[in-house]
């Protein structure tokens, strides 16, 4: 934890400097590689970790080495991870998907914005200094057309996005030749389908079945295609966003870039303070990953924070505003029904979801059904016109382990399953949000209930936190639950930072939350038996046993922390080649002793073999050549 707290001015200045000096940066001893597909422009980025050779013998003067293969890994950093690409936040990222969108011929540019709020913001000269300068002309589906990846998948069309994803999900494992690295324990997949090789047709089939989604708004062409589904790698979401009391546009863009560097597969902008519209534009134009929002937050701002004053018209305008900016998925709390609210009365912690509490208050004050539920088909029509995926929010999720798996939670979940079928009628992609706070023994039921009642739509959970006693460490309490539910089939995990329940996370908190959740997601992939998931573990173990310290650092999820911890006690360069670490020292290093035992055993085997041959030679009379019948 930092010893000195920066002032607000210092934080903004630091963020501005980060943006102004931003350039493509590779991780230590890594390089950016691209694997091309058959569709024009399909060029899938990955990070390749270069490894040093293994000493296998020879003399001090003439050592003999064996090369170690480079390890390809999934990379969410987009252009920010390529030192060859010039970064200019003022201009935004290259529009990777624009040619693919245009080639389909089913969209049209809008001459005027559909949202009244957007029109008002654009007409306000006072916002010129805050506004992103390179605004896109938004597109929407032509009349009578649907432009969703689900629609294409159901038509049997393999889009460039699907091919991109197939290559990306395979993680370049076909490049690995070593049997040691390719070895993998069988997993327990709990019914997940995990093919040895992911093809574009498999991606299409999973999307068509509703088991996976590709969040890819036609107005966010900068994003690199990714997929969320239990038959693919477990994904991680990072939340960012300003509030009424802290953070700025510069800081949120900095957090976006930082999040993608540390492995965020998607980012949710949960801004609730001033300049929500302008902040979101900067984020979208500079984001290589899908961006999600909770539109009710901004709709509430438009009615001065008074939940009772919310209207369908204000909410609809917000959906159009955000869809035309390029938001890839909306969290919609349409399952918080009026009749479910009394079910929460006996809870220890009531309704803890911000969106859920807003809708519950609206329902009670008007004594009417949730307007999101009532207008759900209209919501789907909007989403189908821009390919905005729906993340059906768990507004009644438990906020404490005491409230886990209660009547209200599962009543809402069943309603989300009904809404999923409605969304699919409109070819709208859907995932389901889940808890929350759930003790370990109760976690699996959440997954089985979701699969049964939500028709195998992807599950997306916040943790869950497995205990409530550790404020300041809730990235850890939730990481346990995240690893478990990821193993059981959860498709995406929403990270929790050390600041959960305590305050708005800063840059370092974002990193800590992401590293924790990348560990959880990877552990789940290993447990499921996702093909190739163990390659990096095997490479790390081999480097560890061979005392290749630099490779150990570079294979780590966080190379900088691994190196820093090592250097606290062995800072000299000689420590990077030592056959021990400071924990056991040179005489008691288990791996060094193990190597000596293995070498000794190998030598003993040779000696015993030679002795046996010698005895056999003497028993046959000591003749060099034997007659054929004696041989």
From Swiss-Prot:
EC number, UniProt record: 4.1.99.17
Record: residues binding [4Fe-4S] cluster: 581, 584, 589
Highest rank taxon of the organism: Bacteria
GO CC annotation, single: cytosol
InterPro entries, alphabetized: ThiC, ThiC-associated_dom, ThiC/Bza_core_dom, ThiC/BzaA/B
Catalytic reactions on record: 5-amino-1-(5-phospho-beta-D-ribosyl)imidazole + S-adenosyl-L-methionine = 4-amino-2-methyl-5-(phosphooxymethyl)pyrimidine + CO + 5'-deoxyadenosine + formate + L-methionine + 3 H(+)
GO terms classed as biological process: thiamine biosynthetic process; thiamine diphosphate biosynthetic process
Pathway it works in: Cofactor biosynthesis; thiamine diphosphate biosynthesis
Enzyme class label: lyase
An example Gene Ontology molecular-function term: zinc ion binding
Cofactor note: Binds 1 [4Fe-4S] cluster per subunit. The cluster is coordinated with 3 cysteines and an exchangeable S-adenosyl-L-methionine.
Keyword Transmembrane helix: no
Keywords for this protein: 4Fe-4S, Iron, Iron-sulfur, Lyase, Metal-binding, S-adenosyl-L-methionine, Thiamine biosynthesis, Zinc
Record-listed Zn(2+) binding positions: 437, 501
UniProt: substrate binding residues: 239, 268, 297, 333, 353-355, 394-397, 433, 460
Names of the cofactor(s): [4Fe-4S] cluster
Function: Catalyzes the synthesis of the hydroxymethylpyrimidine phosphate (HMP-P) moiety of thiamine from aminoimidazole ribotide (AIR) in a radical S-adenosyl-L-methionine (SAM)-dependent reaction.
Family of the protein in this entry: Belongs to the ThiC family.
Subunit structure: Homodimer.
Protein's recorded name: Phosphomethylpyrimidine synthase
Species this chain originates from: Escherichia coli O7:K1 (strain IAI39 / ExPEC)
Gene designation per UniProt: thiC
